[in-house]
Regions:
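Membrane-embedded alpha-helical bundles of multi-pass integral membrane proteins
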Residues: 1-282
Length: 282
């Protein structure tokens, strides 16, 4: 069975479990009362809140975007409390958001539009994302943003296990989350380094992505390229490495709704709602 089939055979159930967990957490939030709709069902409350949010966004889209960037992603209030905490938060959240966006662009253009361009020439521009001029920017961006996540994770670990502020409580959930992130980032860089050090991995199409552009194998992928210098003599089954990274990634994906990482999603809603109350949208 080819890698695409194996991946989607694992990804689709993972997506279902992720949405199931997200739905469960959402149902807990919707148990509260909604002003003016005290007797509404959970589904009715969800529809009302979505409607209010959409109407507000349509009136002031730039305001919503500004609040999302300044108050959620870069958490400006935290900056005044602790630069270290602010830096850790910003590296992790911005790193995750940026990596997700770039990865979605790369995956959609190189994984779908390139295929569609074979029968629909209108999508031929997508080849610039696969092997053309845009590809080096994608490779470097993914590398850089992944490095930000790794740096933020290390800062969080140092604060929790070395500095240990008196007011900070480290729970088992925090340890699991940080170790998950650390493992996924390190394994990702290791696999990239091994792939660069062993060109036969690319020719055998062990991984799903297209690694033909030179930018995928040189200093633009700086983390993997540096590791590749030490992995040329190492022999590891590349299929094993693929599973070692993909399976924990999907487990982590399922785990998100049940972890404090859900804060990345819920905090944006809470912060924007609070700001909207202080500054009514007219």
């Amino acid at each position: 069975m080819e890698k695409h089939s194996i991946f989607y055979a694992m990804f689709i159930p993972s997506m279902f479990l992720f949405l199931l967990g997200l739905g469960f957490r959402l149902s807990l939030y919707l148990q509260g009362t909604l002003e003016g709709e005290e007797n509404a069902t959970s589904w009715r409350k969800f529809v009302i809140l979505m409607g209010r949010g959409w109407r507000g966004f349509r009136k002031k889209p730039l305001w919503y975007l500004r609040v999302l960037i300044s108050d959620v992603i870069f958490h400006r209030k935290l900056y005044g409390q602790s630069f270290y905490r602010w830096l850790t938060h910003s590296l992790l959240v911005f790193g995750f958001v940026a990596t997700f966006l770039v990865d979605m662009i790369k995956g959609f253009t190189t994984g779908y539009l390139v295929e569609w361009s074979r029968s629909l020439p209108v999508f031929s521009f997508a080849h610039a994302f696969e092997t053309g001029r845009i590809r080096p920017f994608l490779d470097f961006s993914l590398e850089f943003f992944s490095f930000l996540i790794l740096a933020g994770c290390v800062l969080a670990i140092v604060r929790r296990f070395i500095f240990k502020p008196d007011q900070l409580r480290t729970e088992e959930e925090d340890i699991i989350t940080l170790l998950f992130i650390l493992f996924l980032e390190l394994s990702g860089f290791f696999i990239e380094g091994y792939r660069i050090a062993h060109p036969e991995v690319v020719t055998r199409r062990v991984y799903m992505a297209n690694f033909t552009p030179p930018s995928a194998n040189n200093w633009l992928s700086f983390g993997g390229f540096l590791l590749s210098l030490f992995l040329k003599e190492m022999a590891v089954d590349p299929d094993f490495l693929w599973y070692l990274h993909v399976i924990p990634s999907l487990i982590f994906f399922i785990y998100i709704p049940h972890s404090k990482l859900l804060h990345i999603f819920t905090s944006s809603v809470t912060v924007i709602a609070d700001r909207a109350k202080k500054k009514p949208l007219s």
